[in-house]
Amino acid sequence: MSPQTETKASVGFKAGVKEYKLTYYTPEYQTKDTDILAAFRVTPQPGVPPEEAGAAVAAESSTGTWTTVWTDGLTSLDRYKGRCYRIERVVGEKDQYIAYVAYPLDLFEEGSVTNMFTSIVGNVFGFKALRALRLEDLRIPTAYVKTFQGPPHGIQVERDKLNKYGRPLLGCTIKPKLGLSAKNYGRAVYECLRGGLDFTKDDENVNSQPFMRWRDRFLFCAEALFKAQTETGEIKGHYLNATAGTCEEMMKRAVFARELGVPIVMHDYLTGGFTANTTLAHYCRDNGLLLHIHRAMHAVIDRQKNHGIHFRVLAKALRMSGGDHIHSGTVVGKLEGERDITLGFVDLLRDDFIEQDRSRGIYFTQDWVSLPGVLPVASGGIHVWHMPALTEIFGDDSVLQFGGGTLGHPWGNAPGAVANRVALEACVKARNEGRDLAREGNEIIREASKWSPELAAACEVWKEIVFNFAAVDVLDK
């Protein structure tokens, strides 16, 4: 008889409550290549043993409930249950543990990030036996990876579409983010693209408000980028935010963008949801559109060290759901992002194979097989003085995005774009000549500013702007 249909009436049913660890803590378990593996940071309530806490996480995120039920006898729990197979104490933290849980692949619908998260994090985070819980990392088996389309195009295809090689791409978020009319918004887009940027961007909360309806914005931005393309001879793009209140409205906006002939659209993947994001990613691949992803709302989920979901997990989920770019923090700007942690999930976004490396917060080796890579986007409080560090940290396969660092230039948007393009080209040239960007960065920018008055003006404006705050989420010592 099949284990799925085998009944265990002969064993008998004993009602009542038993400890989770009797069923779900299995330190002898040998993980399988097809298991989804999870690393949880667990903070139990006082008096709850770590083994019971880890087993409770495995149970409540798979087949378990708070009491024994007679229908357990109608299936094979051994086949379907999650298992806490290892627990380790977090050094330097009181009553914190890393609980490793293995989930059999049969628990998850193919090609559905929505279902994966609903199972693994959907209910267990409110469990009373835990003071706090954080999902630190996931190992996605190749058998499951292959059920996802992933990014619509990936890094190499994007470079071929844009005909841009050998340097990071350069972008700008249009400011003020809210309040401009569609025509004035399009004018700002044109000036930035004409000045030398590759992309401009809708801010995450620009959808279709009374001061600027989406269709008007799309039309004026398309006019701006085509005019800038004609003048510069370079392919340009503007991230047209298709995020909407319904999937149907989102798709209507994406279809209109394709009809306009623009190269890229945008989605807020956490507020919009994984189902909507995957739907849009499939449309973008089928219709030749690049897809820029904003991570609005991520810090609500990932910023606290002891509770929530680490961004490296959200980044992996985005690569599965689909996106060609995603915001990843800057390390040097105004937003949260410790260097080693950021570089860890940047590699998880871009590379095909990533080895376990706890020094960068990577708990599991991850093989993405044929899933395309995602370009990390550095954005938030950055300006020309940051250019050497950004070029050194993120390398060529990245998007460096300056909003206020372009539009805040004292001479206007186009000179602001010129300043950033000159700074970028100077840093890339210096790097290619073997110069040390980390040590000589300021000197490289000063040298370039001697023959670029736009860059010299930008250097003067932002020479004293720093964001000296320690990161909240740091690696365990």
Curated annotation (Swiss-Prot):
PROSITE patterns: RUBISCO_LARGE (PS00157). The keyword Cell membrane does not apply. Substrate binds at residues 123, 173, 177, 295, 327, 379. It is found in: Plastid, Chloroplast. The disulfide bond which can form in the large chain dimeric partners within the hexadecamer appears to be associated with oxidative stress and protein turnover. It comes from the Eukaryota. The modification N6,N6,N6-trimethyllysine is found at residue 14. Pfam families: RuBisCO_large, RuBisCO_large_N. Its EC number is 4.1.1.39. The modification N-acetylproline is found at residue 3. RuBisCO catalyzes two reactions: the carboxylation of D-ribulose 1,5-bisphosphate, the primary event in carbon dioxide fixation, as well as the oxidative fragmentation of the pentose substrate in the photorespiration process. Both reactions occur simultaneously and in competition at the same active site. The basic functional RuBisCO is composed of a large chain homodimer in a 'head-to-tail' conformation. In form I RuBisCO this homodimer is arranged in a barrel-like tetramer with the small subunits forming a tetrameric 'cap' on each end of the 'barrel'. Belongs to the RuBisCO large chain family. Type I subfamily. This is Ribulose bisphosphate carboxylase large chain. It comes from Solanum bulbocastanum. The gene is rbcL.
